[in-house]
């Protein structure tokens, strides 16, 4: 059996056929023997890893003592010796176990036992490594804790073509069923009546419309009030303008109130009556009489005609007298006409 240990964090892979240590190859022909051999190899590699850690610790202690010549504490020597003894005992046990595996036939065991054995071996190794990497006392008298990271190799990967057994499938189905039942019990919801939001929306809409109506009414009232105020202001401005348009006249003079001066009344003579002339042949006597009558009418005086004298002399003298009187009466009328 060849053991191939890689220092990568993927761990250690052991092959029973003696092939090259390629971690990608898979041995499918002998799965049970491969698993047992891998467990033994893991134990052996873990022990070797513990020995390397112990040797490193001893080397560090020796360097410290060589640099500073101070007496080593006794407790550290005893602890280191105990660790070396336990590691040697584990080596002998692993060698004897490998020889027995070659001679005896392997018995098929379930996968669970191999995992338990691997877990127990890792626990024992970690406890030993922690004891070895404990407190270290330095010669200056101060105690310091040196924590070394214990690298635990990973478990080998299972081959890809392995399938779960029927028992594991049944267990997984049963566990899934139980978990589903528990979740169903925990998910029990109390039934309640459905609450519709349409009623709430209708109420909100109604409130909104009422507020809108109130707002519109307030705006209309304010508008009417503003119109009334503007009307009153315009009327007051018109009144002031009319008052300013009235003009004030100065008092009239005295002669306007007094009447015109009285007019002098003129005495007019009475109007004369028109008389149509007699047309035709006239006697000389009648002609003279007509002339005298016209003159009398013109002078507006009645003349007393004496008895007709048959004598021409008497008539001529009377005519002359009347003619003089007429001239005297006509003088004031001609002066007024001018």
From Swiss-Prot:
Provide ranges: composition bias, Basic and acidic residues: 74-84, 306-331
Tagged with keyword Cytoplasm: yes
UniProt keyword annotations, A-Z: Coiled coil, Cytoplasm, Cytoskeleton, Microtubule, Ubl conjugation
For the keyword Transit peptide, the answer is no
Bias-annotated ranges (Polar residues): 97-109, 121-130, 172-189
Stretches for region Disordered: 68-204, 248-338
Question: What Pfam families does this protein's entry cite?
Answer: TPX2
What is the protein's name according to its record?
Protein WVD2-like 3
According to the UniProt record, one GO cellular component term is: cortical microtubule
Residue stretches in coiled coil: 210-240
Q: A single GO molecular function, which one?
A: microtubule binding
* Entry comment describing in which tissues the protein is expressed: Expressed in roots, root hairs, cotyledons, hypocotyls, trichomes, flowers and siliques.
Query: What role is this protein assigned?
Result: Microtubule-associated protein (MAP) that regulates the orientation of interphase cortical microtubules. Binds to, bundles and stabilizes microtubules. Required for the organization and stability of cortical microtubules in hypocotyls. Required for normal hypocotyl cell elongation. Acts as a negative regulator of hypocotyl cell elongation in the light.
């Amino acid at each position: 059996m060849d053991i191939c240990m890689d220092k990568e964090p993927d761990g250690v892979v052991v092959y029973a056929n003696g092939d090259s240590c390629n971690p990608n190859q898979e041995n499918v022909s002998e799965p049970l023997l491969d698993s047992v051999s891998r467990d033994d190899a893991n134990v052996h590699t873990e022990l070797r890893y513990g020995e390397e850690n112990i040797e490193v610790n001893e080397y560090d202690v020796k360097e410290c003592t060589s640099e500073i010549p101070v007496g080593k504490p006794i407790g550290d020597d005893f602890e280191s010796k105990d660790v070396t003894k336990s590691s040697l005992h584990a080596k002998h046990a692993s060698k004897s176990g490998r020889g027995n595996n070659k001679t005896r036939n392997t018995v098929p065991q379930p996968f669970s036992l191999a995992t338990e054995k691997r877990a127990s071996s890792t626990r024992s190794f970690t406890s030993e490594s922690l004891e070895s990497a404990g407190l270290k006392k330095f010669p200056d008298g101060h105690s310091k804790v040196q924590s070394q990271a214990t690298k635990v190799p990973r478990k080998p990967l299972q081959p890809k073509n392995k399938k779960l057994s029927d028992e594991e499938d049944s267990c997984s189905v049963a566990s899934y069923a139980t978990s589903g039942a528990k979740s169903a019990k925990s998910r029990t919801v109390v039934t309640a009546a459905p609450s519709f939001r349409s009623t709430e929306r209708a109420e909100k809409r109604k409130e909104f419309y009422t507020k809108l109506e109130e707002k519109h009414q307030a705006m209309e009232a304010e508008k009417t009030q503003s119109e009334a105020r503007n009307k009153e202001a315009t009327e007051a401005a018109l009144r002031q303008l009319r008052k300013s348009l009235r003009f004030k006249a100065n008092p009239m003079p005295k002669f306007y109130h007094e009447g015109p001066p009285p007019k002098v009344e003129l005495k007019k003579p009475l109007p004369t009556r028109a008389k149509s002339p007699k047309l035709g042949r006239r006697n000389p006597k009648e002609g003279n009489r007509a002339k005298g009558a016209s003159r009398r009418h013109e002078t507006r005086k009645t003349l007393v005609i004496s008895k007709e004298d048959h004598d021409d002399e008497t008539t001529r003298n009377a005519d002359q007298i009347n003619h003089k009187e007429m001239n005297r009466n006509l003088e004031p009328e001609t002066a007024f006409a001018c």
